[in-house]
UniProtKB/Swiss-Prot annotation:
HIV-1 lineages are divided in three main groups, M (for Major), O (for Outlier), and N (for New, or Non-M, Non-O). The vast majority of strains found worldwide belong to the group M. Group O seems to be endemic to and largely confined to Cameroon and neighboring countries in West Central Africa, where these viruses represent a small minority of HIV-1 strains. The group N is represented by a limited number of isolates from Cameroonian persons. The group M is further subdivided in 9 clades or subtypes (A to D, F to H, J and K). This is Protein Tat. Residues 1-20, 45-101 are annotated as: Disordered. Residues 61-79 have a biased composition (Polar residues). The modification Asymmetric dimethylarginine is found at residues 52-53. Transmembrane segments: none annotated.
Amino acid sequence: MEPVDPSLEPWKHPGSQPKTACTNCYCKKCCLHCQVCFTTKGLGISYGRKKRRQRRRPPQDSQTHQVSLPKQPSSQQRGDPTGPKESKKKVERETETDPDN
């Protein structure tokens, strides 16, 4: 190895900087471009802002921490509560009483 000027900072040593600039490409050649590219692209290590992660849902069986809610009434049927058979009879009665139509 050739001697290096001790007054130079390590990142300014000859040969420490690549001749070409770093790119956003993730091909094998660009991932091995320099040490920075290798750690960020190749290994996926970055010390910048963290990406937002989705929260993991708790397992279904661990509901001991939740306050018990009162049971809701069973779903009520929509529409006529008398049922479809009685409504048909009702329509028949109305048509019998109005023979004018």
